[in-house]
């Protein structure tokens, strides 16, 4: 089998009268790392803000209050900025995706590193033009508010193929219209 083990593509036909269903499952290789980075980042942000008053109150080797205030300001600004950048870059990262029929379920991480589920029908998703797209995203919703997602292209081929197929205009068979 040429496909990676992270993707399970299966077509199931059960013995009873159940219908044929096609399912694609995507499991991101970096989901644990991204989740841990987000949790560490928000933890360090909280710790920085909790310890800031202590840094102001302690007399640290003759440093003036202005110097201590600028150190606290710099620490809080740096931690806030790094947490914001990590969240912005990783909020589109899809940790798990499941395609069942015409519905794609996507799990991403919120700012706290907890899973966030989004579900879309395939006609509400599009593969954007790479020149005009948001960085760190290769899939976007067409609904408002617009959401962006990143799936590893080499691991999510069945999902991208299904979206491309859903984007193609439907052809009307002339024999059916009579």
Curated annotation (Swiss-Prot):
One Gene Ontology term, aspect cellular component = mitochondrial inner membrane
InterPro entries documented for this protein:
TMEM70 (IPR009724), TMEM70/TMEM186/TMEM223 (IPR045325)
Entry's transmembrane regions: none
Could you tell me the Gene Ontology terms of the biological process aspect for this record?
mitochondrial proton-transporting ATP synthase complex assembly
- Could you tell me which PANTHER family the record lists for this protein? TRANSMEMBRANE PROTEIN 70, MITOCHONDRIAL
Task: Output this protein's name.
Answer: Uncharacterized protein C1834.10c
Q: Which organism is it from?
A: Schizosaccharomyces pombe (strain 972 / ATCC 24843) (Fission yeast)
Species classification = Eukaryota, Fungi, Dikarya, Ascomycota, Taphrinomycotina
């Amino acid at each position: 089998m040429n496909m990676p083990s992270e993707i399970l593509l299966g077509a199931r036909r059960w013995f009873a009268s159940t219908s044929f269903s096609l399912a694609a499952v995507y499991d991101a290789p970096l989901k644990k790392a991204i989740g841990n980075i987000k949790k560490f980042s928000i933890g360090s942000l909280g710790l920085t803000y909790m310890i800031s008053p202590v840094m102001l109150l302690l007399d640290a080797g003759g440093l003036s209050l202005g110097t201590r205030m600028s150190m606290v300001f710099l620490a809080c600004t740096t931690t806030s900025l790094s947490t914001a950048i990590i969240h912005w870059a990783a909020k589109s990262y899809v940790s798990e995706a499941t395609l069942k029929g015409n519905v794609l379920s996507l799990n991403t991480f919120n700012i706290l590193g907890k899973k966030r589920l989004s579900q879309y029908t395939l006609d509400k998703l599009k593969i954007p033009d790479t020149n005009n797209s948001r960085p760190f995203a290769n899939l976007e919703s067409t609904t408002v508010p617009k959401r962006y997602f990143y799936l590893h292209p080499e691991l999510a081929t069945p999902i991208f193929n299904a979206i491309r197929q859903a984007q193609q205009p439907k052809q009307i068979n002339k024999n059916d219209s009579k």
